[in-house]
Amino acid sequence: MIELDINASDKSLSHRAVIFSLLAQKPCVVRNFLMGEDCLSSLEIAQNLGAKVENIAKNSFKITPPTALKEPNKILNCNNSGTSMRLYSGLLSAQKGLFVLSGDNSLNARPMKRIIEPLKAFGAKILGREDNHFAPLAILGSPLKACDYESPIASAQVKSAFILSALQAQGSSTYKENELSRNHTEIMLKSLGANIQNQNGVLTILPLEKPLEAFDFTIANDPSSAFFFALSCAITPKSRLLLKNVLLNPTRIEAFEALKKMGASIEYAIQSKDLEMIGDIYIEHAPLKAISIEQNIASLIDEIPALSIAMLFAKGKSMVKNAKDLRSKESDRIKAVVSNFKALGIECEEFEDGFCIEGLEDISQLKQRFSQKKPPLIQSFNDHRIAMSFAILTLALPLEIDNLECANISFPQFKRLLNLFKKRSFNGN
């Protein structure tokens, strides 16, 4: 059995730990922080807002928030991080000062009206480009009044931005979404003293009566990153894998459950349950069958590109529907998946809200074809999840990715661990 501690700290928790520390008034410690480009953007913005950040150990920081957030004399650069832009928008909406949030070309083309509308419901003064659809965003911090909001989309980023504004508003606010999204924000903030209640899917958020409690938080491994190696095991004959110290929040393991429904042998072993469930995941290769994914999309939206690779190895036609939000990620991920598969000669079809893929029962035929002619270069579209998903396919096919370096956005150790998996699995270790 291959045993991997993937050393890929959870991206969602790393962002939130930094941003939430700014609502405390005492130093906070974040251990095992994800040193990916996205999370480092959140850390740099915290510094630009006046926080003191000290490196106290490998991948560990002490963050001392300022008494009041500083109005920066420059644009707050989120680079490629949608989480940074959306959560900081909620935080800064009630802070004194003028704040401008911008990013790279990819981020500035992603939809931002989805957070501007709920923040404006509080009375927030926030503007975006092209009639509030896109960044850069300009925020003039101002007093907020409580509101009730029903979101048309299930998005943890939208929900988190709303909560951060609600904590600074006057009165009790409520938030409802049409499908459960990741709940790390609620869990973390409640543990730090925020009054957030969930009744039948409706969140009630009361304003903070005092600053959040200081914390010392160690971040577990990211299940979204771990999933790439669960996928590696699922498509590699005779392989068995143990993934250690993985965050097992129920809103984060839907992709593992989908892979399990496809036939992979997957078991969880919970090792601790303090703030969040953390444990190990056991995976064993087994023949895969086709799957239809149409529900709980918000809980596996990031893993759908990787699941598309599993679908290629499955018997039958697999389908993804109700996933239109894939078109609004770092790339149009529906188009990215389908165009790469079609370039490889794989039968697939693109829909407005998803795609279908006809699985190959015998991948060796495709491998033989590419032994006779050079396969097309896989296009990452500079999207880390597209690049890593198709990199897993190199376990079975002699492919090259045009820009695997973009994996550093969320998973700096990816290339090293993939090479390690190849070495151990093909050596029968």
Curated annotation (Swiss-Prot):
3-phosphoshikimate binds at K11, S12, R16, S155, Q157, D302, K329. GO terms for biological process: amino acid biosynthetic process; aromatic amino acid family biosynthetic process; chorismate biosynthetic process. It catalyses: 3-phosphoshikimate + phosphoenolpyruvate = 5-O-(1-carboxyvinyl)-3-phosphoshikimate + phosphate. Keywords: Amino-acid biosynthesis, Aromatic amino acid biosynthesis, Cytoplasm, Transferase. SUPFAM superfamilies: EPT/RTPC-like. One of its GO terms (molecular function) is 3-phosphoshikimate 1-carboxyvinyltransferase activity. It comes from the Bacteria. Catalyzes the transfer of the enolpyruvyl moiety of phosphoenolpyruvate (PEP) to the 5-hydroxyl of shikimate-3-phosphate (S3P) to produce enolpyruvyl shikimate-3-phosphate and inorganic phosphate. Monomer. This is 3-phosphoshikimate 1-carboxyvinyltransferase. It comes from Helicobacter pylori (strain Shi470). The lineage of its organism: Bacteria, Pseudomonadati, Campylobacterota, Epsilonproteobacteria, Campylobacterales.
